[in-house]
């Protein structure tokens, strides 16, 4: 699908490589000595904007296909080496303090047992009793024993992460091999503050063509701090947030906000929409009901809709179906949200059936 203002002069490299991969598969499955591949760009209305045919031998297809797979093969091997080193270090891991505080050992045992048995655990402990260490330590031991694939430490606020970071820092003093990633809010990580689209941001343009080397550099490093992730992203001109999203697939521990695991709109789909063995350690879980209500609630602002309708009207005209539909929605919102007391805000217990 081509959405540019001018016809393409050459195929985008990723699109050409996709065609080459198809060509290789045809050569292998049908025993072809050569194959003709073609990248075609069309508009939404079906108008052809560019055609780029190419004839390749089976050997040329095979060589290019292998060149695409090679970085992923290196990544798999690196992850396996790291996993062996990580598990060995976790097997030797000791509790980071000489003695347990009251209740810490019991909590650690319950956390480990819950992970092993794939059960939920709701634990209450007073502030200052070392909950972060009492949950992370057994979770890491379970990770090293293959009882879980990843550990996600979820917090309600950024300030709450420090306890988990301090606990991990103390554990790292034991020569721990661990890829621990912190995910910050997307708007805080954005260095350009432009529209997140390849047409407007150089970091978004071709991001996934450049992130392979950056991921390899991170896998060779022990420092997965937010500062180092941003530094590597800058080095390769990557979007720091999308780079962190790629790293979370191979990270051992991820520290992030509730949203990235539980909010249907912004959760990490490549992790939580897939069948993965993930353990969630949810700090201050009593905040969850309010946060979940916010995640699942929606609001409609007729003033905002009017501004958007004005933009649509200038671009497409007042007779456009979208403009008319927005007018209908604005009228419906005004009629629904005007309480008897005359205030400009209202709350609906549920949406009307005909809304």
Label for each model-derived stretch:
Residues 81-124:
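Conserved pre-motif I regulatory segment
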Residues 33-35, 148-149, 176-179, 275-278:
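Short glycine-/polar-rich loops that comprise or flank the Walker A/P-loop
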Residues 87-90, 94, 147-254, 259-262, ...:
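A substrate-engagement module of RecA-like helicase motors
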